[in-house]
Amino acid sequence: SKHKADMIEAGWDVAVGHGNGPQVGFILRRSEIAAKYEGMHEVPLDVCGADSQGAIGYMLQQTLQNELVSRGIKKPVATVVTQVKVDKDDKAFQNPTKPIGSFMDEAEAKRRQAELGWNVVEDAGRGWRRVVASPLPMEVVEIESVRALIAAGTVVITVGGGGIPVIDNNKGGCLGTAAVIDKDFASSLLARLINADLFVISTAVEKVAINYGKPNEKWLDKITLAEAKAYLAEGTHFAKGSMAPKIQAVIMYLENGGKEALITNPENIGRALRGETGTRIVRE
């Protein structure tokens, strides 16, 4: 929260997205254990996502509010439980790849597949797991509320964990669906929808590198959209589960009218905003 407060103190209006990687899995696992041993109902995946937004949002808004108060800054902070619409025809639904929940034996996995329509896979010799789709985010359902809060001077925490995935219910409304949306893609969409001047991705490294971990490793200070696309296309620079989606998210943002993106680690956000470190990605 200190790093976000630094941005706010420097005059930025801030909207915050966050992941929910382990937490949503723990919520699901607790519900599966409670169902198995206590006969309680299992919590659907979309509701697990909502639970995680509430809990993580509460922690973020409280710690950020406390930090702002300690600096004498009067600025409200609020979390919006956020639904993100995906396309029910997204090809990700035909090829679910995200493992979630508990390990099962084959018999249990096959039973759930038959009774509940789950997609299940054998996971590296460790047992069977459910897999769900990771579709692309298309629309932030609560975007008007988010915009109104930002306009009123509120720091908004939104699209937590990539948002609660929902599909069109064919009546103009929404219906929750079992999926996981990439947090970087959802934050990229949010940045475009609020017309952000800067899209900051806070991660574990100070700068982005090409040839990461190799003798010819090179840390990048500033690259263009075209360079980012070329490096991504080469397929050898960015790890699939970590940096690659962040670069993809930046590309989506810049290709759809975004102005500038910045990737760095939390403790260097202040310095990176002053141009002293981090990797900036610009349109040209």
Please report, for each region that a protein language model flagged, where it lies by residue.
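C-terminal catalytic "cap/lid" subdomain
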Residues: 1-284
